[in-house]
Amino acid sequence: MSQKKQKIQVEQKVPENVAKKTQRDSKLRDAVAKRRTERLAANKTRRAQWEKTAQAYEAEYKAADKSLVDNLRKAKTEGGFYVPAEAKLILVVRIRGINTLNPQVRQTLRLLKLRQLHNAAFVRVNKATIEMIRKVEPYVTYGYPSRAVIKNLIYKRGYAKINGQRIPITNNNVIEQQLGKVGIHSVEDLIHEITTVGPHFKEANRFLWAFKLRGPRGGFIAKRKSFINQGDWGNREDLINDLVKRMI
């Protein structure tokens, strides 16, 4: 008589500590995946908002340009004159070095963020800043920057000043972390605040490190002569844009 061999299946029980670790790891993976999904969704929403804001600014700029053209045409048709609003923003560029600088001039250049040759900085127009520029006028040239030049400077030469460090503005997160509390979340917000000399211009301008430009293509004409005397230093008004384009 043949005997049936019974197979005894031994159920191996997973140790409790291993089971708990597996469960914990699974929950951790789920939490990480959830956070990643939420982060991607938030980034998508922010990018959409940045794009919407940029489009709104572009519409605002076009409307302002159209208004200026319309006013000029109207004045010409009526035989009158149209006087644009006074400039609220100046771009100052240092064109001479440090030789034979007296302490007062040196300090004023530092206050204007012009510590080095070919540094450039934005300055809000008021009585105090005009007096500062006059003190250092033989060492700088300045004028009224166009929106295009402001944009090119920030995009191509813009660095942030964070805790005394010069940090490249590689994405909008750098701006949002430092200026989000005053409503500046993106590079287009930053450009708009500078261009319009908005209510938080001080914070926006303080955030920007001085622009480090190169010597202009073709060189300067005569740095020891004023611009009105066929030289370089002093007020160029709108012609500052031609110079800065050669220095970016």
From Swiss-Prot:
It comes from the Eukaryota. Residues 1-44 are annotated as: Disordered. PANTHER family: 60S RIBOSOMAL PROTEIN L7 (PTHR11524), LARGE RIBOSOMAL SUBUNIT PROTEIN UL30 (PTHR11524:SF16). The gene is Rpl7-1. Binds to G-rich structures in 28S rRNA and in mRNAs. Plays a regulatory role in the translation apparatus; inhibits cell-free translation of mRNAs. It comes from Paramecium tetraurelia. One of its GO terms (cellular component) is cytosolic large ribosomal subunit. This is Large ribosomal subunit protein uL30A. Transmembrane segments: none annotated. Gene3D superfamilies: Ribosomal protein L30, ferredoxin-like fold domain. Belongs to the universal ribosomal protein uL30 family. The keyword Calcium does not apply. GO terms for molecular function: RNA binding; structural constituent of ribosome. The lineage of its organism: Eukaryota, Sar, Alveolata, Ciliophora, Intramacronucleata. InterPro entries: Ribo_uL30_ferredoxin-like_sf, Ribosomal_uL30, Ribosomal_uL30_euk, Ribosomal_uL30_euk_arc, Ribosomal_uL30_ferredoxin-like, Ribosomal_uL30_N_euk. GO terms for biological process: maturation of LSU-rRNA from tricistronic rRNA transcript (SSU-rRNA, 5.8S rRNA, LSU-rRNA). Residues 8-41 have a biased composition (Basic and acidic residues). Keywords: Ribonucleoprotein, Ribosomal protein, RNA-binding. Pfam families: Ribosomal_L30, Ribosomal_L30_N.
